[in-house]
Amino acid sequence: MKHLFASTLALVIATTSTVAIAQTSGGGDAPKQHCDSGYVTGVGGAAQSFREYLALPDRDRYRYFADHQIQCKISDEGRAFDCTGVTNLKHEQMSVYDDSDGATITVTSRVELDQGTYPAIIVVQRKDVQCGQ
């Protein structure tokens, strides 16, 4: 039930954020927004899993999301590492780790795992990032 709710919420958020971006963008080639921190809302995950998720047609993303929930190992210092899968982020605070890609951005954000909530390095769509405090 939790996965169904999270998956449905992710789909609604993804659709809503796409519409909002389309309404606010003036078209043309806008310069890439640079920021060091902010918030992220949408689907994100381990690099390989997130690439697989984005490569799927929209109709197959729901099933992929449900079948590939994020899982990570936890270090002695309390950090998530060696992650696989994807997760839904709801206005999570983040710090930019790598913004060299045009469509995605690698961030450090807290993710909810079976063991609790831990900081992890994940990839999200650039359009899902809101810069600022």
Describe the residue ranges of each PLM region.
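Generic preference for well-ordered secondary structure
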Residues: 6, 73-78, 91, 113
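Repetitive helical segments and hydrophobic/amphipathic motifs
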Residues: 11-12
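Bacterial N-terminal signal peptides that target proteins for export
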Residues: 1-8
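N-terminal secretory signal peptides
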Residues: 22-82
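N-terminal signal peptide c-region/cleavage motif recognized by signal peptidases
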Residues: 15-19
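SH3/SH3-like beta-barrel superfamily modules
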Residues: 24-33, 83-129
